[in-house]
């Protein structure tokens, strides 16, 4: 039951019958109901007003349209398993039973006392409804039939949607066989090369790695199967580039395999000089260092120019020169080792200082969070039961909801007075795929553990007014508003045993997201939600049971 309530004036209500009918219709989807917080709520897409959808009325299109006398005042659909009350009203059996258990033993239309055992089947209405003509709900089907024959028709209707067992998509029954055999991306096929079974959509990836698929050599353009290609590159391909066989001695030339023989013939003298330089390096290197020489590094030995004559033994370095060079290297190593020790010590000191600073920063962050929480708590103490929740960045929340990601946020806690009950609000943007509540704003109130819980009577008794404020500038301002009375028998209003009661109380379909565009409910990307709580009992000075005031002892 959503209403538009102007702040500037109060509109007169409709007749009692219309009001009662609206209240009854709200019991199913559009009114307050006990709802778990997201950690314990039903999955998104499941109607939170009923755990099993089938027990509601018949949600089909009648031809001609359904008469109001056959409509359930609760679910607003055609009566299913119609029952009648002593006061003459008809309901779906499941709808009225749930209403009696959740909302109390009274008729949702006229509030007359009503017990479950007073309900009796209305076979006349049931027979009349089953005889009404309905249209097939399958898109493309134009057949009509009596309601009693609808289920049998759906089992045979070629336009009825059925699920593909391979890709879980929905398709008309007439197209399912063609889809599964020729169109489904998950249909089973076999690789023509290796015979491996796979899904059709995986074939493109398999073709890139299939070991028996034919591929073309990028050098000689020979066609071979993929698993033969490595050996072809390394041994057979005449066009593949290979290094010179003297690359370990310093030759950096690369050529095609069929040009290797010519290269060896043309560069014979150069290869001999490279080998000579390598041997000469061995003769001048201490024995302990010979093992450190790598023959795999072509840059280690530079080729000798062709104009350079062979080295004469008199040009070779003496033993004294080698000893002096060794001493110089040792001194350099000692200096570097000392520098390394000093730098290691400095690094350890810097790490210790950084850890100290990190600890200090974490303590400051904790202090800041604590102060922020205290500031919010102070604001909650002084709201006196009228709390306005400012939600910034609402467009970002809507974008997340459009991506089928759940959006659930909680407000800071606030008190109904001092002393008073501590409450908070929960806002939930229903996903586009949710049944019967898609794209709705859900709004709930949760009790929280507060400072005065031991001084207050439980459960909570009072009236709660929830509003989404209109931020338009003008004389006429229309807030989206709902008013509800607490229900002491629900867990949502019992004294909480955790920081926040997991049970909430409010509206699954408080306001549709499209309604936000009709007025300026969102301004500067900000939405305002107002909650006003009126406690029915005097919680400021509760009278204890059995307390008797004592008269004074007299003047002294």
UniProtKB/Swiss-Prot annotation:
Keywords: Coiled coil, Cytoplasm, Lipid droplet, Metal-binding, Nucleus, Repeat, Transferase, Ubl conjugation pathway, Zinc, Zinc-finger. CDD domains: MATH_TRAF6, mRING-HC-C3HC3D_TRAF6. It catalyses: S-ubiquitinyl-[E2 ubiquitin-conjugating enzyme]-L-cysteine + [acceptor protein]-L-lysine = [E2 ubiquitin-conjugating enzyme]-L-cysteine + N(6)-ubiquitinyl-[acceptor protein]-L-lysine. Residues 384-533 form the MATH domain. The coiled coil domain mediates homo- and hetero-oligomerization. Its main location: cytoplasm. Its EC number is 2.3.2.27. It comes from the Eukaryota. GO terms for cellular component: cell cortex; cytoplasm; cytoplasmic side of plasma membrane; glutamatergic synapse; lipid droplet; nucleus. Pathway: Protein modification; protein ubiquitination. GO terms for molecular function: signaling adaptor activity; tumor necrosis factor receptor binding; ubiquitin protein ligase activity; ubiquitin-protein transferase activity; zinc ion binding. It comes from Xenopus laevis. Belongs to the TNF receptor-associated factor family. A subfamily. Pfam families: TRAF-mep_MATH, TRAF6_Z2, zf-C3HC4_2, zf-TRAF. A zinc finger (RING-type) spans 72-111. A zinc finger (TRAF-type) spans 152-204, 205-261. It is found in: Cytoplasm; Cytoplasm, Cell cortex; Nucleus; Lipid droplet. E3 ubiquitin ligase that, together with UBE2N and UBE2V1, mediates the synthesis of 'Lys-63'-linked-polyubiquitin chains conjugated to proteins, such as IKBKG, IRAK1, AKT1 and AKT2. Also mediates ubiquitination of free/unanchored polyubiquitin chain that leads to MAP3K7 activation. This is TNF receptor-associated factor 6-B. SMART domains: MATH, RING. Residues 318-356 form a coiled coil. Homotrimer. Homooligomer. GO terms for biological process: activation of NF-kappaB-inducing kinase activity; innate immune response; lipopolysaccharide-mediated signaling pathway; protein K63-linked ubiquitination; regulation of apoptotic process; regulation of canonical NF-kappaB signal transduction.
């Amino acid at each position: 039951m959503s209403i538009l309530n102007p702040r500037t004036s109060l509109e007169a209500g409709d007749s009692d019958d219309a009001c009662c009918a609206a209240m009854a219709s709200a019991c199913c989807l559009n009114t307050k109901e006990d709802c778990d917080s997201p950690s314990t709520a039903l999955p998104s897409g499941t109607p939170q007003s009923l755990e099993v959808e089938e027990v509601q009325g018949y949600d089909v299109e009648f031809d001609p349209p359904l008469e109001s006398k056959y409509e359930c005042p609760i679910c607003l659909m055609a009566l299913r398993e119609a029952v009648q009350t002593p006061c003459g009203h008809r309901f779906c059996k499941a709808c009225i039973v749930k209403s009696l258990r959740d909302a109390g033993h009274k008729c949702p239309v006229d509030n007359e006392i009503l017990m479950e055992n007073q309900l009796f089947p209305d076979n006349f209405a049931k027979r009349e409804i089953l005889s009404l003509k309905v249209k097939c709900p399958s898109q493309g089907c134009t057949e009509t039939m009596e309601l009693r024959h609808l289920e049998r028709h759906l089992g045979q209707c070629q336009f009825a949607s059925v699920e593909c067992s391979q890709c879980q998509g929905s398709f008309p029954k007439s197209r399912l066989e063609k889809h599964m055999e020729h169109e489904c991306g998950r249909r089973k096929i076999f690789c023509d090369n290796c015979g491996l079974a796979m899904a059709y959509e995986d074939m493109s990836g398999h073709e890139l790695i299939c070991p028996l698929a034919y591929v073309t050599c990028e050098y000689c353009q020979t066609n071979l199967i993929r698993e033969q290609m490595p050996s072809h590159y390394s041994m057979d391909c005449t066009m593949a580039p290979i290094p010179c066989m003297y690359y370990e001695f310093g030759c950096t030339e690369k050529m095609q395999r069929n040009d290797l023989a010519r290269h060896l013939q043309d560069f014979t003298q150069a290869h001999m000089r490279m080998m000579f330089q390598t041997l000469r390096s061995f003769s001048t290197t201490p024995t302990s260092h010979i093992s450190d020489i790598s023959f795999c590094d072509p840059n280690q030995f530079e080729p000798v120019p062709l104009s350079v004559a062979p080295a004469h033994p008199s040009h070779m370095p003496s033993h004294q020169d080698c000893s002096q060079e060794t001493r110089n290297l040792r001194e350099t190593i000692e200096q570097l080792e000392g520098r390394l020790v000093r730098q290691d010590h400095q690094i350890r000191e810097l790490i210790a200082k950084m850890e100290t600073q990190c600890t200090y920063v974490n303590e400051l962050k904790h202090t800041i969070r604590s102060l922020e929480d205290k500031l919010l708590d102070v604001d909650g103490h002084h709201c006196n039961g009228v709390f306005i929740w400012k939600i910034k960045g609402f467009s970002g929340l809507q974008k997340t909801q459009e991506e089928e990601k759940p959006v659930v946020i909680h407000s800071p806690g606030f008190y109904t007075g001092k002393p008073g009950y501590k409450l908070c609000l929960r806002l939930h943007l229903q996903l586009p795929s949710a049944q019967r509540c898609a794209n709705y704003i859900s709004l709930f109130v949760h009790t929280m553990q507060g400072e005065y819980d031991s001084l207050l009577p439980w459960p909570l008794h009072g009236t709660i007014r929830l509003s989404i404020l209109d931020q338009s500038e003008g004389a006429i301002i229309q807030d989206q508003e709902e008013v509800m009375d607490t229900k002491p028998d629900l867990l949502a209003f019992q004294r909480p045993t955790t920081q926040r009661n997991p049970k909430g109380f409010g509206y699954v379909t408080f306001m549709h997201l499209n309604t936000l565009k009709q007025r300026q409910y969102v301004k500067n990307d900000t939405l305002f939600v107002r909650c006003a709580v009126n406690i029915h009992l005097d919680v400021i000075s509760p009278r204890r049971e059995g307390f008797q005031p004592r008269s004074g002892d007299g003047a002294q």
